[in-house]
Amino acid sequence: MNAAFTSKLKHAALAVIGLMLCSCTNLYYYGPAGAMGGTRYLEGYNPGDVRYSNQQNDTESWWKGDEASGAPGIVISLRQQKAYYYKGGRFVGMSILSSGDDQHRTPVGSFTIQQKDRHHQSSQYGDYVDASGQPIKQNIDRKIDPMPPGAKYDGANMFYFMRFTRGIGMHAGFLPGYAASHGCVRMPERMAANFFNNVQIGTPVDVRN
């Protein structure tokens, strides 16, 4: 992606973000999905949080990327909690998201897609399970939670994972309507799939406040 296109992409993103400021306070919730297992670290699910009592549908995300051609690019707005997808400099898709919380902020800067893994699992967050796969201890952090005797680690699912720096990437997950992750960028599954299928290793990702 040349400098002229990058500049065009950034200016277009700023214009779109400015037009959408009025919608940044809407809350969204996806899940829990039974197939996701016990852990909710990466999905941001907290069954004790009253904000989860009313489920809402995603009425903002949209996709026309399959109809466009050209080099892809992504702009992520942490303030808006939205990801903007471009092809050939054209704005052709947008997804709501949930980025890192105050203790695990999503890094800001210019990155590129470094890894794609459709069935990725976290190496740090998940559950300790027994030999049959039944949870012994859920929602664990391997860095601080010791493994019980006889248990094994089962990493949290991060489907359609698109790594753009270190352990941080975009992936499908629950969205509570605010920044709630451990640094990753969670998206509705259908939008994560759209982005995943339309990026390559090296696709630029611009993360901004």
Regions flagged by a language model, labelled:
Residues 2-209:
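N-terminal pre-domains immediately preceding structured catalytic cores
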